[in-house]
Amino acid sequence: MKNRKYDLAAFMMAVLVGAAVLFGCGESSGAVSKEEPLTVYLWENSLIKNLVPYIHEQLPDQDIEFIVGNNDTDLYSYMEEHGELPDVITVRRFSGTDAQDLQPYLMDFCGYDVVSRYYSYALQYYKNSDNEIQWLPVCGLPQTIIANKTLFDQYGIKIPSNYQEYAEACQQFYENGIKPYSLDLAEDWSAHEVIQAGAIGEFTSLDGIEWRSGAETSSREVKFDDGLWKRIFSETSRFLKDSHLGKDDILVNADIAYQTFVEGKAAMFHGYPALMQQLQTQMDAQLICIPYFSQTSEEAFVYMTPSLNIAFNKDLEKDQEKLETALDVLDCMISEEGQRLIANGRCVISLNTNVPTMMQDISGLEDEMKSNSIYIRYSAQKSFSASLEAIHGLLSGEMDEAQAYDAFRSAMNAEDTEEKAVVNFDREYSIALNDKNGRDAASSILTTVRVENNAQLAIAPYYYFTASIYRGECTSSRVALMTAKSSDTSLYFAKINGEQVWKLVENYLDHTEDEFSITNKYELPILSGMKITVQKEENGFLLKDIAVDQEKIDKEKEYSILLTDDTRSILEKTTPGCRIKRLPDMTLSSAWTAFMEKGQQPLAPEDYIEVEK
């Protein structure tokens, strides 16, 4: 077993002398306690498809259950209130303020050597008010301006290397009838980015760093430095004007902004390098990344979003074997291959001293990467809606800089409105596997949505269901968190015969998509209106039987079936030409939430699966 813990004094001395203890991912340090698996919640389902197979490959003898959560720490607060905080939790949108109610229940990483493998800048905002590090970022994704270099060259416009040149380039494109910057300002994340990236010189100044440190550890009202924030909104306003962004851009969503850039009607867009590579395949143009420029100096910075932030349940320290397994999982995540898989490509900023940054195919950021000129996004939940309100006020002309700052500050410090309960659950259903390898909470949710949409059958991947249904009153927002809202799926309706149902289920069990396939009991699908019997084999599961109404499925009979994005895709392959109808304005999460908002009880879970050994 690896000795991963050491006292804080020794750790600080190691940091001072520049020592770092390096560990690989592949060596397993011990099995999980036999009673229960290690539960790891990943904030979106792409991580289930990309990362989980790699971790299982590295740690084949360890009992680990991966479940998709949500990009919201309130999910984990809800689970903790009912005594079910998972062993390992992750989110992308994160600030210390949002996670304060979890602070008593999370482990401090400061006593473990994993902290010594991080660059100091990566952890500067991760210490809480007790000087503990309870969350760690796992690799970063650079969010930059994406420039159409071919368009720049066509009009003889220089690729900017400072803010003044950026403003001049925007003006030249505007005079030539080309939109300088296509930005999806209908989206909260883009409004959020404009404030921090447009005034990035202020956020990276000593005043900005001091404010950020205080904001991350604030337990109540976030204090604002008026001098700093007046400068921030002055520079934000200037950035919007210099970029020729105005009232019409309030309604520009991600699809519109993307298409405008693809069609060559705009010179610049924004996004991660992986998006730039995707754009490159669609455009007959050379693309290049541009960093965000300080308006107060010649400096430029890469605006970075951690791909995920991870925390451990404090109770892990009471079970050394389970803790070692959790640390093994973390080792896998921060390994070179783990970071590449998390970032879904090669373009990733490593935050760890023993793993190189992987930006080989991206040009335009070389100087900033070499000098570690990286700004980590501030991501308090309230800051997104606050940014949207302030930016829309500036764009519409309804607010000047001072009013926009006042609106932002007020929104950040507004007291949370007490949300009223919409349903009082009279029963409790667990998301954990039952003794037949089914998930009662997931079954209840899927069955409720199926019946509400008048379908006889339904099949869905397990990773669309996140939390137990707890007895008692529940608000609408927490009802929504019982499904993977951050990785939601559309719903589809089809009519197929029993033989086609068999092929659909059989192929789902065999299906490999993006290197993800069902290899263990935790990954089995959720079904409703039917019961399947499967046999465990060395590399997966074999379908043995399907029963409907306790009788073997009729291969000739037609059945209506409710599908998700993934199961629809499989049906299109197994039954080409099958008519599949997308249910309008409906997702799994919205359908479930809407039904519960009526105040009715969910339907009981079904006995939908049996695993033969």
Spell out what each predicted region is:
Residues 418-613:
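Catalytic centers of hydrolytic enzymes
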Residues 134-137, 167-221:
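Extracytoplasmic/periplasmic solute-binding protein
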